[in-house]
């Protein structure tokens, strides 16, 4: 656990952190620091902590209230561990809100088992399962990432525009993997593509030759891997390359990151993919450099935006009580109001303190829709000379 303290003044909180204007508050950052997507967590956490620091050091947040952060490990795949970590953040750390979790299953478990019963706001930067769009949340759950219902459509369009008319699909055997695989298959076949096979795989296995044999037998011009970049997914790629079953892949969001690039390099040349992102992410580079994290890493902009939106909603509400500020998330995220970009949080706080309106764009061009999730902007990638390269935005 890492804790960033930006003041030494002690504060006493009610359970759940529902103190309106205390001298300091704490926000929990609940991400999968261990598990199959662990390499994604540090830059996401760093980005969220950078936003908290920016707000706190401005001196403009709720009459000078200081913002502290504390980390919890959701492990990505262990629902019990995610719930226990969320419980600790609320009952022991007295947080006023939670940024997280990282993976969809852990997010759903932590929210439904802990956050919802305790009336706590959660904003996930990266949980994308379509199933989270319809959970009963009492207006407490939000996402700065879009649903995989949207990613499935984007993925289908990219493949067909690149004249890929048939694919095999394998997905990590959990809510995220199945939700994305099903959304993609529906969109791809509706547009005229053929899915030759759509099967799950388990993460953490030493050998994926059996799964790859089934995929190869079904055929397809490319292999779509709706898995994780630190477990499962690399094993599938390695087995496919070793056997010659596939040499071109399509990589969804949780398969894109430095660890994949470092491991396979130019063996993945010509492979395609997509991850939530917008041109605004380039504005995060300087913030990342100043705070020792990669500002353009997958889901880092969404991490910054999740923290920024939570704190700006508190400022708009004049309260750190989740039952109060939850009703202001849409107000600060969407038009009308002055557009707010990364690094402009002090400006936003001042506008809100003066009774004005803001339209927070942030690093991911976030716009909240119906169920409290981002409408969705994606960065399209291609592996060129062994490097994950941005080729456009959608």
Locations of regions flagged by a protein language model:
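Hydrophobic h-region of N-terminal signal peptides that target proteins for export
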Residues: 10-18
């Amino acid at each position: 656990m890492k804790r960033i303290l930006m003041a030494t003044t002690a504060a006493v909180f009610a359970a759940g952190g529902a103190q309106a204007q205390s001298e300091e508050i704490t926000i929990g950052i609940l991400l999968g620091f261990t598990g199959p997507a662990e390499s994604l967590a540090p830059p996401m956490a760093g980005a969220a902590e950078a936003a908290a620091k920016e707000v706190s050091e401005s001196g403009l947040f709720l009459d000078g209230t200081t913002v502290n952060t504390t980390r919890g490990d959701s492990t990505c795949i262990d629902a019990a561990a995610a719930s226990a970590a969320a419980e600790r953040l609320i009952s022991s750390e007295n947080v006023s809100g939670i940024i997280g979790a990282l993976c969809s299953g852990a997010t759903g478990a932590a929210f439904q088992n802990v956050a919802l019963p305790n009336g706590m706001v959660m904003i996930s930067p990266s949980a994308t399962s379509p199933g989270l769009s319809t959970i009963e949340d009492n207006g407490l759950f939000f996402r700065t990432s879009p649903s995989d219902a949207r990613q499935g459509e984007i993925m289908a369009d990219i493949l067909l525009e690149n004249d890929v008319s048939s694919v095999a699909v394998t997905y990590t055997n959990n809510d995220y993997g199945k939700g994305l695989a099903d959304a993609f298959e529906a969109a791809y076949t509706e547009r005229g593509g053929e899915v030759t096979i759509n099967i799950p795989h388990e993460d953490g296995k030493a050998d994926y030759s059996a799964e790859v044999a089934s995929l190869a037998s079904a055929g397809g011009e490319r292999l779509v891997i709706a898995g994780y970049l630190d477990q499962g997914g690399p094993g599938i790629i390695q087995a496919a390359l070793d056997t010659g079953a596939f040499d071109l892949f399509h990589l969804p969001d949780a398969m894109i990151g430095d660890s994949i690039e470092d491991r396979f390099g130019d063996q993945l040349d010509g492979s395609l993919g997509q991850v939530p992102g917008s041109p605004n992410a380039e504005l995060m580079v300087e913030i990342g450099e100043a705070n020792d994290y990669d500002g353009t890493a997958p889901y880092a902009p969404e991490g910054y935006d999740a923290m920024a939106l939570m704190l700006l909603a508190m400022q708009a509400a004049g309260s750190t009580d989740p039952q109060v500020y939850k009703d202001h998330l849409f107000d600060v995220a969407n038009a009308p109001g002055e557009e707010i970009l990364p690094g402009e949080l002090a400006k936003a706080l001042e506008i809100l303190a003066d009774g004005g309106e803001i339209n927070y764009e942030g690093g991911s061009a976030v716009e909240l829709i119906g169920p409290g999730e981002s409408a969705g902007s994606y960065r399209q990638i291609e592996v060129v000379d062994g490097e994950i390269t941005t080729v456009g935005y959608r």
